[in-house]
């Protein structure tokens, strides 16, 4: 199994490099990191790829969307230290109540409750929330994430974060203008195979070729 995994990663890395070599150059290597070309940014707008924020002893979270993945996310957060669940929101009030029961079952205080079509905006406008966690239908991800960032909140959004290239850039531009984190919650990006393949590709691409070593 380990041999198969290694071969799989090696082949994937080679294919990745071949694709890079065969395509028009749209990247550069800076300090061993492949940096892809990107459109010019508006004045005062800066990349958030290496954005850092001041440490937060307690991260205050508000959840939007409690129908399918939302309740599971709420429950997982109840097991985390340094987290306070401050607000819960869904179109339907009964879903909010069910998530309140999750908090009660963990002996945690009830969160502020929001419902209806505009409740999520009220949640985003609160001044005691650091992170907005979005678990709503796909077409609502971008408008909610943008609104939250524009109101000073960091954002975690379920997959897919956006439904078009234009929407992707809308998220990027808003994150850069507001200097707020916007993370798509795709855990497979950080799995063993993906990270191993990426590291192998970077290592192969940035290491001297056998010809250069001689």
Task: Explain the meaning of each model-derived region.
Residues 133:
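N-terminal Rossmann-like NAD(P) cofactor-binding module of classical short-chain dehydrogenase/reductase
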Residues 8-16:
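Bacterial N-terminal signal peptides
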Residues 205-212:
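Conserved small/polar residues in nucleotide/adenosyl-binding loops
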